[in-house]
A protein has these predicted regions:
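Small-residue-enriched hydrophobic alpha-helices in membranes
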Residues: 1-126
């Protein structure tokens, strides 16, 4: 996977975690699990942490989508499959999370059903 994929995924994961206004322990543990599962190098994670300090949601979204739109179709599908699985982690899917997923999937030029199929083929995050 490319640096664009890793960074774009991290930006959108952060945005999804914060979408409902509650970043609970399960979601934060899921961030670490995603980092490990997707083999995101520590230097990329540190770059992400530094770059996102104080960023507002709109800036996170713009940066994440820009990075993901520079990815292959397969990387895009994988990104949104991971995000779909992440939305299930805390046991409740908030309306803001659904809106974010649907808008992001549309902006990336993907079909929702394709994302769902990829997500269902992935193991649960936690």
């Amino acid at each position: 996977m490319t640096a664009n994929y890793h960074l774009g995924l991290l930006y959108l994961v952060r945005l999804l975690i914060d979408a409902d206004g509650i970043a609970d322990a399960k979601e934060l543990a899921a961030l670490q699990a995603i980092k490990d599962r997707e083999n995101i190098p520590e230097e990329i994670f540190e770059k992400f942490e530094e770059a996102t300090q104080g960023m507002v949601h709109a800036d996170l979204y713009t940066a994440g989508i820009t990075l993901i739109n520079g990815c292959s179709y397969e990387e895009k599908l994988r990104t949104f499959g991971v995000l779909y699985r992440l939305s299930e982690v805390d046991g409740r899917v908030h309306v803001k999370e659904i809106r974010l997923l649907l808008n992001s999937i549309n902006t990336a030029g993907l079909e929702f059903d394709a994302v769902v199929n990829v997500a269902k083929a992935m193991p649960v995050i936690l």
